């Protein structure tokens, strides 16, 4: 069984999306994903701000690990940095897709700020 996984976390920012740059999705796909509430991706799977994937049909085109399977791996390290990735990182954390995050100080503070704003609004 898999004991360790290392993944990245991608944003849906047009200028920062590695999926868009690589031609794996189009600008139209990006617009559809945003319309469905998606904020980011990890392991090639897109998710919303709470980490949910329900209703995001583009995920059916992916051949690879399911996010539910990623949750069962004892140690999942995600590497991500940059302010455009903050909503995606927080969504991945809320989804339980990682338990170790490698990032920089500025990104970490922005994640904590966004998380505390969400708590205050509820």
Predicted regions and their residues:
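Conserved phosphate- and dinucleotide-binding cores of soluble alpha/beta proteins
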Residues: 1-122
């Amino acid at each position: 069984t898999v004991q360790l996984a290392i993944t990245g976390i991608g944003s849906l920012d047009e200028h920062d999306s590695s999926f868009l740059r690589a031609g794996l999705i189009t600008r139209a796909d990006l617009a559809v994903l945003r319309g469905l509430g998606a904020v980011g991706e990890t392991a090639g799977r897109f998710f919303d701000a709470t980490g949910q994937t329900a209703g995001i049909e583009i995920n059916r085109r992916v051949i690879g690990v399911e996010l539910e399977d990623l949750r069962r791996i004892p140690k999942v390290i995600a590497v991500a940095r940059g302010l455009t990735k903050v909503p995606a990182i927080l969504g991945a954390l809320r989804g339980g897709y990682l338990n170790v995050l490698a990032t920089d100080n500025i990104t970490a503070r922005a994640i904590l700020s966004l998380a505390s704003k969400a708590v205050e609004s509820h």
